[in-house]
Swiss-Prot record:
GO terms for molecular function: 4 iron, 4 sulfur cluster binding; metal ion binding; rRNA (uridine-C5-)-methyltransferase activity. S-adenosyl-L-methionine binds at Q293, Y322, E343, D392. It comes from the Bacteria. This is Uncharacterized RNA methyltransferase PG_1095. Keywords: 4Fe-4S, Iron, Iron-sulfur, Metal-binding, Methyltransferase, S-adenosyl-L-methionine, Transferase. The active site is at C419. GO terms for biological process: rRNA base methylation.
Length: 465
């Protein structure tokens, strides 16, 4: 089969008898033997058995875990072609499928840094690591920790299988060093530090989170399933001694069935309880539970574009919807009269207020609650109709009542930041349905090189302007 194009979810595609087949890890121009692994009414899913003639654009992957990890599906695609594919993805979602008329489709803003760009990585300990095909027979029947223990990423679609990661080109290089040190330290005494059994909910070592900032600060969070004080203290002391540059060394005792720590107490072992990121002279406190865009450099570019689209002069009332920890709200506050941020997570709103105080920003207000319950007509009448609305919703997009509230508020400009162009197109169509708004420009931003994910910013302007 000849692979003809890149497609959704990081797949490539070919056609068999007018039916589309999605094939992961293929490149346009590849001629390959493909096995059908799933057949639906309108499409098929396949996998490469062998590549008979590689595409001239195909390049060698930079990571030994490529095709198994699932994290960077486009390592074999040159970056400039990745960018073109993401541009096309946005155009298809908005214009071809969403029927949204956009006056100016601006070119994608690529990332200067295409490796080691993530500021946050989370790893899972497992006593049943994923065995590669060449390992299966070699270790058959050997269930020793040396063979079966792993610390790394979940295999896609398999919650209880973890790929033992020896190198990762996403996070800062120090993340590799810390992860490998902790792994080897625990492996010296596996009875004292048993890796977690995800299916049977047993073990001690559960997850590991490492966060970094562009200013060089470093946070390490070790999550244990139970509290073995002596084992915990010995491990954390060893980590602190080996990596004195750690700004914040934290731990969590999580006895729940799931790995989320949002409802768990985060305890300080050494250093500060937070790290600080900096953006255009502003400081942002980041705790273990705080949300912050995982590509710091591109986050600045994304927010800069959003602020530029907002066209602020200093007199505007701005609503920042889905404000998170108030990064956008605080970022634009210096060019607005007042900014009101709304967010579902109460802890995030506390972070937003803290960040305003940290930077001496006095013209922000933050409210916590479900967006559709907070952003009502009464709220708008009480706080004033915004001149500009900036919205950055989750992948699912905005609730229809939120769209209705925005239309009631009738701002002069709406800046829509999205990590999902498909739901963005749906919401834009609703905002533009009665002709009150027109889509003036759209600009994609690549936050995640070597993946299919893309952010997009769209400016809507009220037609009376």
């Amino acid at each position: 089969m000849e692979i003809t194009d890149l497609a959704a979810e990081g797949n490539a595609l070919c056609r068999i008898d007018d039916m589309v087949m999605f094939v992961p890890f293929a490149a346009p121009g590849d001629r390959c033997t493909v096995q059908v692994v799933k057949k639906k009414r309108n499409f098929m899913q396949g996998r490469i058995v062998s590549i008979e003639s590689p595409s001239p654009i195909r390049k060698g992957p930079f990571c030994t875990h490529f095709t198994v990890c699932g994290g960077c599906k486009w390592q074999h695609i040159p970056y400039e072609i990745q960018l073109r594919a993401k541009e096309q993805q946005v155009t298809d979602a908005l214009v071809r499928l969403g029927k949204v008329e956009v006056e100016e489709m601006q070119p994608i803003l690529g990332s200067e840094q295409t490796e080691y760009y993530r500021n946050k990585l989370e790893f899972t300990f497992s006593n049943k690591r994923w065995l590669l095909p060449e390992e299966v027979q070699e270790v058959d029947g050997d269930f020793s920790p040396e063979v079966r223990y792993g610390l790394g990423f979940h295999i896609p679609g398999m919650f209880d299988k973890v790929l033992d990661i020896r190198e990762c080109h996403l996070g800062a290089k120090v993340s590799d060093e810390i992860r490998l040190f902790i792994r080897e330290y625990c492996m010296q005494d596996p009875e004292r530090y048993p890796f977690f059994d995800l299916r049977n909910q047993e073990g001690l070592m559960r997850t590991l989170m490492i966060r970094t900032t562009s200013t060089g600060e470093l946070m390490v969070v070790v999550v244990f399933f139970r509290d073995d004080v002596a084992a915990r203290e010995a491990l954390l002391a060893a980590v602190a001694e080996r990596f004195p540059q750690i700004t914040s060394l934290l731990y969590v005792i999580n006895t729940k069935c799931n790995d989320t720590i949002g409802d768990q107490e985060v305890l300080l072992y050494h250093g500060r309880e937070y790290i600080e990121e900096e953006m255009e002279g502003l400081k942002f406190k980041i705790g273990a539970k705080s949300f912050y865009q995982t590509n710091s450099r591109q986050a600045y570019q994304l927010y800069r574009i959003a602020r530029e689209f907002a066209g602020l002069t200093g007199d505007e009332l701005v609503y920042d919807l889905y404000t998170g920890t108030g990064t956008i709200a605080n970022f634009v506050a210096g060019q607005a009269h007042r900014v009101i941020g709304i967010e579902y997570v109460p802890e995030a709103i506390e972070d937003a207020r803290t960040n305003s105080l940290l930077n001496g920003i006095e013209n922000t207000l933050f409210y916590a609650g479900d967006m559709k319950d907070i952003l009502t007509n009464d709220f708008i009448e009480q706080h004033g109709r915004p001149d500009v609305v900036i919205t950055d919703p989750p992948r699912a997009g905005m609730h229809e009542s939120v769209i209705d509230a925005i239309l009631f508020a009738a701002p002069r400009r709406i800046v829509y930041v999205s990590c999902n162009p498909a739901t963005q197109a749906r919401d834009l169509a609703l905002l533009m349905a009665d002709g009150r708004y027109r889509a003036v420009k759209s600009r994609p931003v690549d936050m995640f090189p070597h993946t299919h994910h893309v952010e997009n910013v769209v400016l809507l302007v009220r037609n009376t302007e």
